[in-house]
């Protein structure tokens, strides 16, 4: 284990895995299931952690680094009441980096889970939508629509 991995493990161990999940329910605008992806990463299950994140986010490598965590998920963390909150952004970035090292990608994750969505995909196939905005929300919307066979145009 490298020193960096040791520090990340310490950050993950600091998470209480709350049942109410204020970091996810109140803090994260995407609703990322933060305690679950941290739990999987702690157990060394990077693919499961990455799959959990990719259910709600297509930009974990970016969001893990540039999201205003202190105002959002980390700002809602129970640990922050009496001390430092869990360093969620660093953990999310670590999961993304490890997933890339292991050759995981959103395409592979979606292909693995696509059989459940075939009926919905058939209904939506060939539909077109316009999305106003090319920021994280617009790009995420476009990616999830594309997964379901919808052609989107970002303006």
Residue positions per predicted region:
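Ferredoxin-type iron-sulfur electron-transfer modules and their immediate structural context
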Residues: 1-123
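N-terminal Rossmann-like FAD-binding beta1-loop-alpha1 element of flavoenzymes
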Residues: 127-153
């Amino acid at each position: 284990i490298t020193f960096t991995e040791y520090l990340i493990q310490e950050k993950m161990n600091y998470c209480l895995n709350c049942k109410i999940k204020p970091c996810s329910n109140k803090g994260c605008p995407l609703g990322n299931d933060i305690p679950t992806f941290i739990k999987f990463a702690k157990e060394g299950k990077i693919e499961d952690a990455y799959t959990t994140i990719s259910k709600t986010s297509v930009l974990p490598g970016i969001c893990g680094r540039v999201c205003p965590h202190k105002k959002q998920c980390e700002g809602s963390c129970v640990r922050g009441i009496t001390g430092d909150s869990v360093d969620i952004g660093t953990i999310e970035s670590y999961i993304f980096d490890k997933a890339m090292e292991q050759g995981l990608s959103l395409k592979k994750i979606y292909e693995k889970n696509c059989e459940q969505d075939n009926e919905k995909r058939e209904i939506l196939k060939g539909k077109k939508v316009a999305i106003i905005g090319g920021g994280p929300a617009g790009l995420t919307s476009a990616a999830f629509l594309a997964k379901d066979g919808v052609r989107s145009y970002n303006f």
